[in-house]
Swiss-Prot record:
Binding note for cofactor: Binds 1 Mg(2+) ion per subunit. May bind a second metal ion at a regulatory site, or after substrate binding.
Task of the protein: Endonuclease that specifically degrades the RNA of RNA-DNA hybrids.
Catalysed reactions, as listed in the record: Endonucleolytic cleavage to 5'-phosphomonoester
Organism from which the protein derives: Shewanella sediminis (strain HAW-EB3)
Family according to the record: Belongs to the RNase H family.
Major location (coarse): cytoplasm
Cellular localisation: Cytoplasm
All copies of domain RNase H type-1, residue ranges: 3-144
Full protein name: Ribonuclease H
The protein's required cofactors: Mg(2+)
Statement: the UniProt record of this protein carries the keyword Cytoplasm: yes
Source organism superkingdom: Bacteria
Length: 156
């Protein structure tokens, strides 16, 4: 599509205890502009926060964009680029005939991705990648801030 805005999104999730208090961090870059988003939850898991971070970033966009989305979560990246196709065909059941974990967030991420051209990239965590380190700090600080907000979809 001609004239799509091109931006970079970096995401990370954190959880103290897993399950426990958790948070996500997002850094969005468009031209010379940078926006940071973070929030925390009372009880959640690291995987839920790794999924929620790109959801929040993508839901913040008002128009279809060309995006390079970088995360240190193989779970999120493989899920959205590979596993989700089979899950949808099988009615959100895994290859081992179990319900897909975090299905509420996978459906939301799938929906939030629509209309965008996304290059899903993985980066090794805690390896000095500036934006990933910033996301990690945002996510950890949100988790450590004694969040009261409930992660509605989390099931212990």
């Amino acid at each position: 599509m001609m004239g799509m805005k091109q931006l970079s999104i970096f995401t990370d999730g954190s959880c103290l205890g897993n399950p426990g208090p958790g948070g996500y961090g997002v850094v969005m870059k468009y031209k010379q502009h940078t926006k940071e988003i973070a929030d925390g939850f009372l009880l959640t898991t690291n995987n839920r926060m790794e999924l929620l971070a790109p959801i929040i970033a993508l839901e913040a966009l008002k128009v279809p964009c060309k995006i390079v989305l970088t995360s240190d979560s193989q779970y999120m990246r493989q899920g959205i680029t590979q596993w989700i196709h089979g899950w949808k065909k099988k009615g959100w059941i895994t290859s081992s005939k179990q319900p897909v974990k975090n299905v509420d967030l996978w459906k939301r991420l799938d929906l939030a991705s629509k209309g965008h051209e996304i290059d899903w990239r993985w980066v090794k965590g805690h390896a000095g990648h500036v934006e990933n380190e910033r996301c990690d700090t945002l996510a950890r600080e949100a988790a450590e801030a004694k969040p009261k907000q409930e992660d509605i979809g989390y099931q212990a």
